[in-house]
Each structure stands twice: as C-alpha cells, then as structure tokens.
Regions:
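Conserved small/polar residues in nucleotide/adenosyl-binding loops
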Residues: 1-5, 252-256
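Glycine-rich, anion-gripping cofactor-binding loops and their flanking helix/strand elements
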Residues: 3-11, 164-211
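Glycine-rich phosphate/diphosphate-binding loops that line cofactor/substrate pockets in enzymes
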Residues: 9-13, 117-127, 193-197
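Peripheral docking tails and interdomain loops at the edges
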Residues: 20-24, 29-85, 194, 203-255
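Acidic/glycine-enriched edge-of-secondary-structure segments
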Residues: 30-33, 95-107, 162-184, 239-241
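A charged, amphipathic alpha-helical module
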Residues: 65-166
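Short glycine/threonine-rich loop-to-helix capping motif typified by GTGT followed
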Residues: 138-145, 171-180, 215-217
Length: 256
C-alpha cells in the first residue's frame, strides 16, 4: 500500500516528500519508549526500493531520523534540513510549538472521549471492545472496517491508547523487557480490561513479527490470570469478514 501512495505523490512532482523516521515515542512509563523497527525504518525501506521512482520524477525524498522526544535537538536538525528551502529558524520554532499544542489537544480530546464512552458503557450496560493495533490499523483499507462492524453489533469501540490514559491504568507484573511504546500501552490496557467486566480486548495483527510474538504471549498471560479472553485477529491472512465477526458475536452470547 505504501508503494502506491508514494508513487502517486511522486507523480504529482512536489518539491519533496517528507516521511521522517522516528525511533522513539512518548514516555509510557516503561524501561524505554522505542518504536518497533518496522514503524521506525519504513522510510528507509521506501528509499532503498523506490529510488528509481524518485529519479524518474525528480522528487526529493526526505526521511531523516527525528528525535521528537528532544525538542532542542529536533530544532537543530530541522533547521539544517530546511535551510535550502529558505525556512527560517523562527518559522521552525513556531511550527514546533503549534505541533506540540496540537498533540496535547489531541491527547485531551482522546482522554475525554474515552471517559465519555466508558460512562455510556456503564450506564447502558453495553459491551466495550478495546481495539488494539499499530498506528496503520487506523486506516479502513487495512483494518477492513472492523471498528464499524463491531459498532453494528451494538458494541462500543475504544482504542488502547485512550484506555492507557485512564487514571487507574497501570502496568501489571511483566516477564518481558518493557521498552516498546505500543507494547507498553497494550500491557496497561490489557490489565485495565481484566479489572472491568464490561470490556473485552481485541488486537489487530497484520504480519508475523518477532516482537508481536513476545507481546502476544505477555498479553495472553495478563488476561488469563483473571480468566479473561484475549482475541488476536490476523487480518492480513483472510478477507473473510464473516469469520472475523464470530469472535465479537461470541462476546454477546457469553453475556446472555
């Protein structure tokens, strides 16, 4: 999918395509906050495999590693990169401030919306599905509109990053080294689900990944300690949504 997107943008002959590498995410309270290698190095893979496309259209592909967790270092790197484009340091500084404000606003909106949905679940005696996945799983073309499908079954959908923000969200005892940003949120979300009977955890999984093998085992352990079900949907192995519907439907029967 990314090849099609990059090819389309290169064909429009922009000044450049901006796709930075980001190896660390926000601090989630773990031993570290790395992004997984796939997310971090995807731009490097694109550069290595699509260089002919960039040459064909004369498109510059900018994919620097950016330390988003270190604003001062980030500012220096951005000044150097955008100097040829006549973008001043003050403009970059203003852009950084706006970006940070936008991120904080998004986090607040996510927190408030998650609280609202949790309250609605409690008041209306609904089933809530905490739908966990990688950032790219937010794309309907990748998630096969599974969130909509769950809604159609009369269940609420929440994201693991929203659940991880809740005040009583915490890390359970872990056997693994907790150093990956997304995994950290998933562990906390799994523990939260085990302590709330009206919630269930469903993870979207798109490819065989060594890191996912580790996190799957750990989350399974967290859930099983309180006799809770853990569902991992390998959505790239089948487009049969009928089969995917079975597990969410089973939750309604278990509570009947």
């Amino acid at each position: 999918m990314y090849k099609r997107q990059i090819y389309d943008r290169a064909g429009r002959k922009p000044d450049f395509i901006w796709y930075p590498c980001v190896d660390k995410g926000p601090d989630e309270g773990g031993a570290n906050s790395f992004h997984c290698p796939m997310v971090t190095s995807q731009p490097e893979t694109i550069q290595a495999n699509m260089d002919e496309i960039f040459t064909k259209y004369g498109t510059r592909f900018l994919h620097p590693f950016l330390p988003l967790h270190h604003p001062a270092k980030l500012h220096k790197i951005l000044k150097r990169i955008f100097r040829p484009f006549k973008i001043s340091g003050s403009e970059i500084d203003a852009a950084q401030r706006k970006a940070e404000a936008a991120r904080e606003e998004y986090k607040m909106q996510l927190y408030l919306e998650t609280q609202r949905i949790l309250q609605e679940i409690e008041e209306k005696k609904l089933i809530g599905i905490v739908l966990a996945g990688r950032p790219y799983h937010a794309d309907p073309a990748i998630n096969h509109s599974i969130p909509d499908l769950i809604n159609q079954l009369g269940m609420a959908v929440l994201s693991e990053d929203g659940i991880a923000m809740m005040q009583d969200s915490k890390f359970p005892p872990l056997r693994v080294l907790n150093q990956w940003t997304w995994h950290s949120r998933l562990y906390r979300s799994a523990d939260y689900v085990t302590r709330h009977a009206d919630l269930e955890l469903v993870e979207l999984n798109s490819f065989g990944c060594g890191l996912d093998a580790v996190v799957t085992d750990q989350v399974q352990e967290i859930m099983s300690k309180r006799n809770r079900l853990y569902t991992s949907l390998k959505i790239d192995q089948s487009l049969n949504l009928g089969a995917i519907r079975i597990r969410p439907i089973s939750y309604t029967h278990l509570r009947a």
